[in-house]
Amino acid sequence: MTFLENVDKAKLRKILLIVISALALIALALLLVIIVVSIAPGSLKKSDIKYVDYTVSEKDISMGTLILADDAHPFTAGQALNSTMINCQQYRNQNRGDVEKGPYYAMNNVQLTQTAAAAAHKLLVAAENAVKEDNLLIKYAFYGDDGKTVEFQTGMLMFLTDYEETKLPEGYAAWFKEHAHEYGFVESYTDAYRYVDEAHAKYMTDNKLSLADYIAYLKKETSRDTVLSLQDANGNKYAVYYVACKAGDKISVPETEEYTISGTNEGGVIVTVKITK
């Protein structure tokens, strides 16, 4: 064997070692990508939550931020909400001060649930600060609705317009489409925004899902064992799953984590778990 042949074999071994190392690094990178994608917000993953039994109440079934209300799903809990509604104009005045100055206005008889009213106030103040146009009105909500849209009865839907009650100004319309989810709202139909909570609003907006479509997706794809991993606009993380049930049934809920239950008005509930670890 010549000296040249020895040199060539040494080079070949070195090249093979480099190739093998490169392939190993590529394989490791692909594995990391798979791991990251599998746990990324907005993806399905196997649940590692420790559960306990919980008996579902009638309130759990019939109320909540994800309750479906349309012609096919009549909302029957409206009367029960009466005493808990917040007048939007009064809330605006109490939290802004001088009624002669902005931000938005609301028709005297429109109301929202306490949670939706607080979120709507933050949303509308942020909108006026960004658009800098004093011309924003809540025309319809729980009371003073249009008499046609069942969803107003939930106390979580508001219809927005200008002071002339004609249409939402273009600047506001564009801003709401981009930022409403940051405050827990999604566009139900043109210029009408429904509160669904921050945990769900970003995912629904990013994936262009109506509330009905979102519920159908959760019903098909999730369970206590397979949850949807979500992250809201503020970086808070959640695990979400659907359970088909009726009042009196036992379902699984987290033993230690903070969670909420929302009825869907179509045969089940959605459990939203706040992930802190």
What label would you give each PLM region?
Residues T2-K277:
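Extracytoplasmic cell-surface/polysaccharide-interacting catalytic and binding patches
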